[in-house]
Design a protein with these regions (language model features):
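A juxtamembrane structural motif centered on a specific transmembrane helix
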Residues: 228-280
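Arg/Lys-rich, often Gly-containing low-complexity segments of ribosomal proteins
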Residues: 13, 147, 239
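Long extracytoplasmic/lumenal interhelical loops at the membrane interface
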Residues: 145, 149-182, 202-205
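Short capping/connector residues at structural and topological boundaries
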Residues: 23-25, 30, 77, 156, ...
Length: 280
């Protein structure tokens, strides 16, 4: 992440990507997986206060680098993933409370220190006031959702090009415009059911390390969906993250696939362990 901050390319105002041989990739997407394995490895046996503090310092460094790179969505995903993995490892509500308070304080500090954070908050608070500049994205997104209504305008009958970066940040708005809000709600239900299945698998795992990994993947997955859809519907400020498996972006799709492969591999391992115990 530090290398990207120094040498990376600026994409849509954020320094988050590299280009090698004409192929652009976003390292922060792949670092998510390494980050989760680091958290699980650090906390699966030792959950002492000293270990949690050391883990928090390292996790905090990741978040700070992402904020400075203007990759606010990834910073939030890393932070929330850390807080909930720590809670899953310790079962201590004080850590959860401290994470929420710390996150709120950090958000306020980021608002005071970084112009790009203030711009996104202002655009979220009153996009109609800034419809010609910083509020243009969110207003066009809301127009698209409203135009689609319940049943949509029909496939290929919408106007997705009116929304900047529709293929990434605002793909949900385009789906609602062409296929309708009902279809969008069904899509949300599919994502939520996938999350619940991840948590169900995590609860059944006896190996603490694998359990924390699956918990972390589930939290990051559902929180990223919340950020994308919430930003596009003006429920929260825009964060610039993709909708897993749906938005355009090879790094995002590949990372999500790897995360699902990891869970599937752990689930197969769990089934085999159950068969061995049943045989005995």
């Amino acid at each position: 992440l530090s290398t990207v901050l120094i040498l990376g390319e600026v994409t849509h105002g954020s320094k988050i990507s590299f280009s090698l041989g004409g192929i652009t990739f976003q390292p922060s997407e792949f670092v998510k997986i390494l980050f989760l394995f680091f958290l699980a490895g650090a906390l699966w046996e030792n959950v002492s206060f000293q270990r949690v503090v050391l883990t928090a310092i390292i996790a905090g460094a990741h978040v700070v680098i992402l904020v400075v790179s203007k990759d606010l969505g990834s910073a939030l995903i890393f932070f929330v993933g850390f807080v909930f993995v720590v809670f899953a490892a310790t079962r201590n509500y004080l850590y959860l409370f401290a994470g929420i308070v710390g996150g709120g304080a950090a958000s306020y500090l980021a608002y005071q220190l970084f112009d790009h954070v203030r711009i996104r908050v202002l655009a979220w608070q009153d996009p109609w006031k800034y419809i010609d500049n910083k509020g243009y994205q969110i207003t066009q997104s809301l127009f698209a959702i409203g135009s689609g209504s319940w049943f949509g305008m029909g496939l290929l009958k919408g106007n997705p090009t009116a929304i900047p970066y529709v293929e990434a940040d605002f793909i949900f708005s385009s789906i609602c415009e062409e296929l309708g809000v009902i279809f969008g709600m069904c899509l949300i239900l599919i994502c939520v059911s996938s999350f619940f299945e991840m948590i169900r698998i995590a609860v059944r795992i006896h190996d603490r390390f694998y359990q924390l990994v699956v918990y972390g993947i589930g939290i990051m997955y559902i929180f990223q969906i919340f950020l994308t859809i919430g930003g596009g519907t003006k429920f929260i400020p825009l964060t610039g993250v993709t909708l897993p498996f749906i938005s355009y972006g090879g790094s995002s799709v590949m990372t999500t696939m790897i995360m699902f492969f990891i869970i599937q591999g752990i689930y197969i391992r769990l089934q085999k362990e159950g068969e061995r115990r049943g045989g005995k």
